[in-house]
């Protein structure tokens, strides 16, 4: 009996395939868009996480691990700091007259000469680094009545006591140290950088032994500036066997100006000047090795590609670099909203449009058509709407780079002026710049992502409206991105709808006739499917009852024998 009921149910399902609407006089056309099984989450103005078919990472988060030697000229400081190379520390003599785009200072660098300090070390370091050269020109200063070329055991040059090669230590000659008053005009067309110093003896005896006077004084002047330094005699921590010190100063002499040096002792005199050049040279502290490669952007961690607008490798950079932001990732949508395709579409494999889900496997376009007609099913991309979306999305990455560079360069220039005037605010300003860059970057990417999603949705709607205008009353909008076409529409007919050559008048009469022709139960209400399935269920139930009644009647008449065993 159970077998008979099951066969009856299957019989009903088989006949259900001949429901009204599945005959050859109608067709279904659905519009849809590309989808992928696993999309990428991006952020928009209205949504923190929205899935798209494709996205591009905008933040460079790793370096090559080495500093590329091309296209920038890299000068490896090895064991020397830039200031030691500038002064002429004996172990840095190999850097004399060198040039660079980027001077790389190493953590292992050390000084190996007379202990010194620079009152404004960072400014001098930055000044020389930006000049990009250690080119030095000797000048004939006229020092009279004193002994020149003083040296120290703390600054060996070979086996002999020495001193910084770019400086001239003056001390008494015999028992006198006459006042020195020397001038040196700048008749060149470029600025001259003079490095000079003041010696601070550790004891009063050392002071008089070297300079006779109990207290010396050094004054260096130009038409624009004057510096006066009085030595501080006193013991300091021992460095390389000495408790005395040298303080290093510098003076820039403009073209047409004149350098005046006046001293009655303790003067560490210049031997000449360094040529000052304007350019984009710089300095960086890094222990990354220098390798044979090419990269426009260098960080202390190593070189990084500059094909992304942002990076979070290091806030210190040199060259054409992405802007530093706090975010580890910022994804730019380069595809449409992703709605993965449902894997099952009911018993009979119905097709659905873009309102329900996207379509996977559309490799030849972003938008397209699927149809179901008397010749079967098929799918084709709509290249025109696809190209319209791609044309507007192409170049989006370049537009983001342009926008960020323009905005951030303005901020950078503005804050650079503040940093130069107010040293106490330097760290605060740097943090503020990074906060602004990070906020602007996130906002800009969210705006672009919102535009991309709105754009791709708009192209889908345009294609749907274009199809609706072609079909008019020949088809019915099914509400899921599909149209039910009320006339026979073979593959050629479907193709004419796709390419925009469909003639609605040709099929108008047939479509109207089919719309109003009653075939079984053809209801327009939203309860159509429910009523159809209920009617089939009742029919199947009645069939089962009839069969069961026949079997019971046959058993009573003796035509069928039924044995029940326990």
UniProtKB/Swiss-Prot annotation:
Record-annotated disulphide pairs: 30-482, 68-293, 80-92, 113-155, 297-321, 489-493
Q: How far does the signal peptide extend, from start to end residue? A: 1-16
Q: Name one GO biological process term.
A: virion attachment to host cell
Which residue spans traverse the membrane? 531-551
Tell me what topology the record assigns in the membrane: Single-pass type I membrane protein
> Record's InterPro entries?
Capsid_hemagglutn, Hemagglutn_HA1_a/b_dom_sf, Hemagglutn_influenz_A, Hemagglutn_influenz_A/B
Q: Which residues are glycosylated?
A: 24, 38, 54, 79, 142, 181, 301, 499
Q: What ranges are annotated Extracellular (topological domains)?
A: 17-530
Stretches of the chain found on the membrane's Cytoplasmic side: 552-566
Superkingdom of origin organism: Viruses
Q: Where is the lipid attached (S-palmitoyl cysteine)?
A: 555, 562, 565
- GO MF annotations for this entry? host cell surface receptor binding
Instruction: Kindly state which keywords UniProt assigns to this record, in alphabetical order.
Output: Clathrin- and caveolin-independent endocytosis of virus by host, Clathrin-mediated endocytosis of virus by host, Disulfide bond, Fusion of virus membrane with host endosomal membrane, Fusion of virus membrane with host membrane, Glycoprotein, Hemagglutinin, Host cell membrane, Host membrane, Host-virus interaction, Lipoprotein, Membrane, Palmitate, Signal, Transmembrane, Transmembrane helix, Viral attachment to host cell, Viral envelope protein, Viral penetration into host cytoplasm, Virion, Virus endocytosis by host, Virus entry into host cell
Which sequence ranges form a coiled-coil region, renumbered to this chain?
none
Question: What does the entry list under GO cellular component?
Answer: host cell plasma membrane; membrane; viral envelope; virion membrane
Q: Tell me how the protein is altered or processed after translation.
A: Palmitoylated.
Q: Which SUPFAM superfamilies match?
A: Influenza hemagglutinin (stalk) (SSF58064), Viral protein domain (SSF49818)
Subcellular location, record wording:
Virion membrane; Host apical cell membrane
Carries keyword DNA damage? no
Q: Where is this site: Cleavage?
A: 345-346
Other comments? Major glycoprotein, comprises over 80% of the envelope proteins present in virus particle. The extent of infection into host organism is determined by HA. Influenza viruses bud from the apical surface of polarized epithelial cells (e.g. bronchial epithelial cells) into lumen of lungs and are therefore usually pneumotropic. The reason is that HA is cleaved by tryptase clara which is restricted to lungs. However, HAs of H5 and H7 pantropic avian viruses subtypes can be cleaved by furin and subtilisin-type enzymes, allowing the virus to grow in other organs than lungs.
Homology family: Belongs to the influenza viruses hemagglutinin family.
Functional note:
Binds to sialic acid-containing receptors on the cell surface, bringing about the attachment of the virus particle to the cell. This attachment induces virion internalization either through clathrin-dependent endocytosis or through clathrin- and caveolin-independent pathway. Plays a major role in the determination of host range restriction and virulence. Class I viral fusion protein. Responsible for penetration of the virus into the cell cytoplasm by mediating the fusion of the membrane of the endocytosed virus particle with the endosomal membrane.
- Subunit arrangement? Homotrimer of disulfide-linked HA1-HA2.
In Swiss-Prot or TrEMBL terms, this protein is called Hemagglutinin
Query: What organism does the record attribute this protein to?
Result: Influenza A virus (strain A/Memphis/110/1976 H3N2)
